[in-house]
């Protein structure tokens, strides 16, 4: 882990700042990590305005299903409002090293997806979480200047048969 980074070498999106909360410089904050509170153990946090900047959170609290955070040295609503809708990144190097068959969501982005008949379905552009399971969002642009999004449930072994994040390939049982 390199705590002296001035910008992330391998940025990973981990959250997003919402609108101002109160008048004392607090903002709503949405964690994209699986264990939402785990986000507060990853530092430094980076934002991208015109260039990468580090932000320091000096306080945080649970608020409904998410959080409110206080950014160091910001004491009023108008100043903190400038952070609304900014995405929070960390550098991949600070994440724990995973076992061989494990991966982070961001590792799945840009994987090529094929069905069991080896037909190309598209490329993973996002993942979303719903109540039942995660969902792969795949962009299919087989026709020139025309694309569609395919949503495939991320159900290991039943629908998602094979994942190789190193070679960026996923095989699914899907028509």
Swiss-Prot record:
Disulfide bonds: none annotated. Its main location: cytoplasm. Transmembrane segments: none annotated. It is found in: Cytoplasm. One of its GO terms (cellular component) is cytoplasm. InterPro entries: PRC_barrel-like_sf (IPR011033), PRC_RimM (IPR056792), RimM (IPR011961), RimM_N (IPR002676), RimM_N_sf (IPR036976), Transl_B-barrel_sf (IPR009000). One of its GO terms (biological process) is rRNA processing. One of its GO terms (molecular function) is ribosome binding. Pfam families: PRC_RimM, RimM. Keywords: Chaperone, Cytoplasm, Ribosome biogenesis, rRNA processing. Residues 100-174 form the PRC barrel domain. The PRC barrel domain binds ribosomal protein uS19. An accessory protein needed during the final step in the assembly of 30S ribosomal subunit, possibly for assembly of the head region. Essential for efficient processing of 16S rRNA. May be needed both before and after RbfA during the maturation of 16S rRNA. It has affinity for free ribosomal 30S subunits but not for 70S ribosomes. Belongs to the RimM family. Binds ribosomal protein uS19. PANTHER family: RIBOSOME MATURATION FACTOR RIMM. This is Ribosome maturation factor RimM. It comes from Buchnera aphidicola subsp. Schizaphis graminum (strain Sg).
